[in-house]
Amino acid sequence: MSLITITQNLGSGGMKIARQVAEGLNIDLYDDNRLQAEALKLNIRPDEFKILDEKAPGLFDRILGKKPDAYLDLMEAVVYQVSRHGQGVIIGHGSQMLLRDFGCALHVRIHASRSRRINNLINEQNLSRESAEKLIRKSDNERNGFFNFAFQRDLNDPSLYDLIINTEKIGDAAAAKFIIDLSASEEISSCSLTALDAMEKMSQTKKVEAVLLKNDINLTMLFVEAPEKGTVRINGMTATQDEKDRIFKAIQAMPEITDFQSNIRVASGGY
């Protein structure tokens, strides 16, 4: 099994390489559209996850205009959900950070100079040089800003990646073949059942947290965990009885949760 994350910048050629890798390994490609489709399986409405479309302009503004913590939890839930299969090519969405502790994932960064990226956009999208420069500048600012906001890390930090490919030196086909060959190594291809089970539990936990945040629940004094599929356990404290009641109501509205275990106390006089 091959689980690969690919991080790219607009115009770097990363999407082409990702498609070739997925086709060469005969595994699924999880781009924006596919991740949104997977979100539906978690009972996440399309309009909720569409806010995280990395290709659409205004990414950072869209997140800040909503409930940012809730949407970050949704993003994590979807990434963990698709990763539990142990194979696939995931494009962006912080997947290199979310899966950094899973040894079975190969994290790849596709790099190209700004001048090469500008020329690629001019040729591929028939843009003027000024338009291409503006589009790349805006895309870079939004992606870097979002990543820093979500993870407090620099998107360009080389320590986040197992492999960095410069597409000015290595063509798309050669890059794809190199990734395919590397993913076949024993260290990368062996993904334990324990790791896959952990991803599924983390996906369920993040989905529950996102639902609670959407319902204006303060998670500061709450601990959410998913010991097994369909089960959620919440321990901690709420400021009011109303907040505690809203937690129960929110969880009961989640059809995928069949066993809700709680030990929630109401603080006397608030926090």
Question: What is each of the regions a protein language model found here?
Answer:
Residues D28-L40:
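Short beta-strand-centered segment that lines the nucleotide-binding/catalytic pocket of NTP-utilizing
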Residues D101, A112, N119-E124, F146-L160, ...:
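N-terminal targeting leaders
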Residues E38-Q87, L127:
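ATP-dependent small-molecule kinase phosphotransfer cores
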Residues T5-R19:
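Glycine-rich phosphate-binding P-loop
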